[in-house]
Swiss-Prot record:
Belongs to the ATPase alpha/beta chains family. Coiled coil: none annotated. InterPro entries: AAA+_ATPase (IPR003593), ATP-synt_VA_C (IPR055190), ATP_synth_F1_bsu (IPR005722), ATPase_a/bsu_AS (IPR020003), ATPase_alpha/beta_chains (IPR050053), ATPase_F1/V1/A1_a/bsu_N (IPR004100), ATPase_F1/V1/A1_a/bsu_N_sf (IPR036121), ATPase_F1/V1/A1_a/bsu_nucl-bd (IPR000194). This is ATP synthase subunit beta. It is a peripheral membrane protein. It comes from Bacillus cereus (strain AH187). GO terms for molecular function: ATP binding; ATP hydrolysis activity; proton-transporting ATP synthase activity, rotational mechanism. One of its GO terms (cellular component) is proton-transporting ATP synthase complex. F-type ATPases have 2 components, CF(1) - the catalytic core - and CF(0) - the membrane proton channel. CF(1) has five subunits: alpha(3), beta(3), gamma(1), delta(1), epsilon(1). CF(0) has three main subunits: a(1), b(2) and c(9-12). The alpha and beta chains form an alternating ring which encloses part of the gamma chain. CF(1) is attached to CF(0) by a central stalk formed by the gamma and epsilon chains, while a peripheral stalk is formed by the delta and b chains. NCBIfam families: atpD.
Length: 468
């Protein structure tokens, strides 16, 4: 066993000296196991740099409290590896692949894969484009998701990114029976706990593996936990040929953890204090998320936008990798429209007649045109009032408000807050509903009948109740 000693500790970054010139390779895992007066010290480091002088600089995967200079460190000879396969379903893990739920250890004979690996080769990639139906009207109509694509959920604090992710996990498991992997990267422990219990109650947990590196953990764990989740998802794709969903909440925290470690590793900061390797790190993660000839990983990533500034290097770098974006807008939450997805800012490269079909494409574009015209008229309405509009514009406003409310919907995962049952709406019903609104079939129904409903049939029922 190759052994070294700790020579310097700078918070989560630790230098280790190996005698005899036998240095561990970059990304190798080093371990410390010893007892001290505070109890057991059980640490894992990952080698990040070779400094010369027989010394390596490493990043700790858990807190370095109680670690002292001179402590003996062992080189495991391989990268951090985590359990994969069916044994991971229904379980909760940390960055190292240790089970952190109360269901005992993972059996020793379960296969473990290293978290660092190459992206699939060019010839293995699949080229066919298929739509993933989510059952959420605003998403399916205006910014549809692609199987094997990468989707960004953008929004500031408290506009509903995590709730939307929970609803997607629920819908995909219930309607498609698909496997999901959830990576909680640097988010609140309470939210992870709530998600776990909600998924246990609804039975979705049996189809899900969960990995957490939360806000209270050192940056090493937060930076690597996304790779842990991805490794588990890759096994289901490559070995079992599954279509897997990988949820990352929140991809910004992955970048944030990298920037915390970067300065301590001695790298020069770049724009806004981020790490100079920002684009490389993001690329290494994102390029592994793809469709191959065997199966696909569709990734849905919540992206926190610092101070709602989309030009910040972290969200801007993430944008480059995405196939679709779902933008959440605070203004819509204030109007009571949930999910608060901005129908004009959200985009998808799948929204083209070749992929979604001519009718869907036409309806989606007409919906966007109507909403855009309404947005342009809002200034006139604010200054002069509705009466000053032409008859044609009055009709646009009339229909746009109904469309805006019909884009809202009740979620299964929000039943305990709203007291109303959630709804899953197939794409063809969504397209039909909006087409009929645009044609003016429901111009006589009250606006409020369109709020927080599923299909157009629910609108008609609501209207009957209101008029009764």
């Amino acid at each position: 066993m190759n052994k070294g000693r700790v020579t310097q500790i700078m918070g989560p970054v630790v230098d280790v000296k190996f005698d005899g010139g036998k240095l561990p390779e970059i990304y190798n895992a080093l371990t410390v196991k010893q007892s001290n007066e505070n109890g057991e010290l059980n640490l894992t480091f990952e080698v990040a740099l070779h400094l010369g002088d027989d010394t390596v600089r490493t990043v700790a995967m858990s807190s370095t409290d109680g670690l002292v200079r001179g402590t003996e460190v062992e080189d495991t000879g391989k990268a951090i590896s985590v359990p994969v396969g069916d044994a991971t379903l229904g379980r909760v893990f940390n960055v190292l692949g240790d089970a952190i739920d109360l269901d005992g250890e993972v059996p020793a004979d379960v296969r473990r894969d290293p978290i660092h690996r190459q992206a699939p080769a060019f010839e293995e990639l699949s080229t066919k484009v298929e739509i993933l139906e989510t059952g959420i009207k605003v998403v399916d109509l205006l910014a549809p998701y692609i199987k094997g694509g990468k989707i960004g959920l953008f929004g500031g604090a408290g506009v509903g990114k995590t709730v939307l992710i929970q609803e997607l996990i629920n819908n995909i498991a219930q309607e498609h029976g698909g496997i999901s992997v959830f990576a909680g990267v640097g988010e609140r422990t309470r939210e992870g706990n709530d998600l776990y219990h909600e998924m246990s109650d609804s039975g979705v947990i049996k189809k899900t593996a969960m990995v957490f590196g939360q806000m209270n953990e050192p940056p090493g764990a937060r930076q690597r936990v996304a790779l842990t989740g991805l490794t588990m998802a890759e096994y289901f794709r490559d070995e079992q040929g599954q279509d897997v969903l990988l949820f990352i909440d929140n991809i910004f925290r992955f970048t944030q953890a990298g920037s915390e470690v970067s300065a301590l590793l001695g790298r020069m900061p770049s724009a806004v204090g981020y790490q100079p390797t920002l684009a490389t790190e993001m690329g290494q993660l994102q390029e592994r998320i793809t469709s191959t000839n065997k199966g696909s990983i569709t990734s849905i990533q919540a992206v926190y936008v610092p101070a709602d500034d989309y030009t910040d290097p972290a969200p801007a770098t993430t944008f480059a990798h995405l196939d679709a974006t779902t933008n959440l807008e605070r203004r819509l939450t204030q109007m009571g429209i949930y999910p608060a997805v901005d129908p004009l800012a959200s985009t998808s490269r799948a929204l083209s007649p070749e992929i979604v079909g001519e009718e869907h494409y036409e309806v989606a574009r007409q919906v966007q045109q109507t909403l855009q015209r309404y947005k342009e008229l809002q200034d006139i309405i604010a200054i002069l009032g509705m009466d000053e509009l032409s008859e044609e514009d009055k009709l646009v406003v009339h229909r746009a408000r109904r469309i805006q409310f019909f884009l809202s919907q009740n979620f299964h995962v929000a039943e305990q807050f709203t007291g109303q049952k959630g709804s899953y709406v197939p794409v063809k019903d969504t397209v039909r509903g909006f087409k009929e609104i645009l044609e003016g079939k429901y111009d006589d129904l009250p606006e409020d009948a369109f709020r927080l409903v599923g299909g157009i049939e629910e609108v008609i029922e609501n209207a009957k109740k209101m008029m009764a």
